[in-house]
Amino acid sequence: MEGSDNGDVEYDEYAEYRDYGVSDGCRRVLLQWVVLPSWFVLGALVVSFALVRAYDVSIPPEYRYLPFLVSIVVFGLPHGAVDHLVPARLRDESPDLRSVSYVMFVYTVFVVVYAGVWFVAPAFAFAFFIALTLYHWGQGDLHASLALLRTGVDSRAGRAATLLARGSLPMLAPLVFFPSEYREVAEAVISVTDVFGSSGVSAVAFAFEPTFRLAVAVFLAVACVATVYFSRSSFEAGELLLLGVYFASVPPILAIGFYFCFWHSTRHIARLLALDPVASERIESGDASGAFFRFV
């Protein structure tokens, strides 16, 4: 709500996006315990791999996959374990059997259908996975930008640009800078379910051509520039720069593993905690550990 010059009260259609109900006290604690550590970890990895390249150090593949596997167990399962409670929380209601059953039904139908698509059209399923993850990660970072960094992206175009930039950097930047590794993962995943001997692997070959990768690079640049333009925020520009350098310099699997552990999952969990009135009060009072244990 905003006051007009004539004393009337005008409706502010973007007010709900400015803080997402995160109080200043809760925000300060989450910045300290969630945002700042993510900057430190990703920044440290950028510096570390600059040194790795400078001294020509080789990292065994198993060590590159380890953070990714750990992230799935330690953060992946917990960060999605309360998804069935989210719709009710978003409506400021207590979860009940009906709301939980509805979410579980929708999830089950989606999983069954999607699993079938993997066997019939694995290349399409892989592309859909990339697109869905891009949206999910971008939407999560959009919330963090608005609620924690207070970037003030009010327009729909600005929010769309932020979502695309934030989601595309982890999903598409490795394709631009590490095409061989990206292709290796894509072909390995697609071939697992390509039981009918379809041309699943060859169907994605175009994505690794220089022309397509150049188009992706241009898309990333435009999305990032548009995000900074709409936000006018140094925090937004700084985080985009950090993410861009990070995914351009750290090997993809290792980069995704640490990003998921220390960036996406922690911000997603922080978002869910902020939606819980009891957890939010504990965070604001400085009891961040109590809020987290309420989550787990």
Q: Predicted segments — roles?
A:
Residues 1-39, 148-152, 156-157, 233-234, ...:
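Haloarchaeal acidic low-complexity proteome signature biased toward cell-envelope/secretome components but also
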Residues 183-208, 282:
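Membrane-interfacial helical/loop segments at transmembrane boundaries in membrane proteins
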Residues 231-267:
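Membrane-water interface signatures at transmembrane helix termini and the short loops
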Residues 59-125:
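Membrane helical hairpin/interfacial module
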Residues 112-176, 187, 194:
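Membrane-interface helix-loop-helix junctions at boundaries between adjacent transmembrane segments
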Residues 49-63:
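Short, hydrophobic transmembrane alpha-helix segments
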Residues 134, 140, 159-182, 211-226, ...:
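Alpha-helical transmembrane segments of multi-pass integral membrane proteins
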